[in-house]
């Protein structure tokens, strides 16, 4: 299953992914990685709110790519628009 997180994908806290790879794309959208930024509507005080998990089997220049269910620093889960 392709469940990559990409720029603009949402979270279970109502936010979205706001930064992503400059080099890796899937289906026309930039792929999010560990360390990329997330906006969280429930926890705006968490700054920087970065993606803290990634799949080490899929990397972009050595940085693990985020997938469905991975989390950001505020605790929200990422939701892939591909599933």
Where are these regions (language model features)?
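Intrinsically disordered, low-complexity proline/glycine-rich segments
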Residues: 1-83
């Amino acid at each position: 299953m392709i469940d990559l997180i990409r720029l603009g994908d949402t979270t279970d806290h109502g936010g979205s992914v706001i930064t992503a790879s400059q080099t890796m794309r899937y289906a026309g959208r930039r792929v999010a990685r560990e360390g990329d930024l997330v906006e969280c509507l429930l926890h705006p005080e968490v700054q920087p709110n970065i993606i803290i998990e990634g799949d080490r089997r899929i990397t972009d220049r050595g940085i693990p790519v985020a997938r469905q269910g991975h989390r950001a620093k505020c605790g929200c889960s990422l939701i892939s628009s591909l599933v």
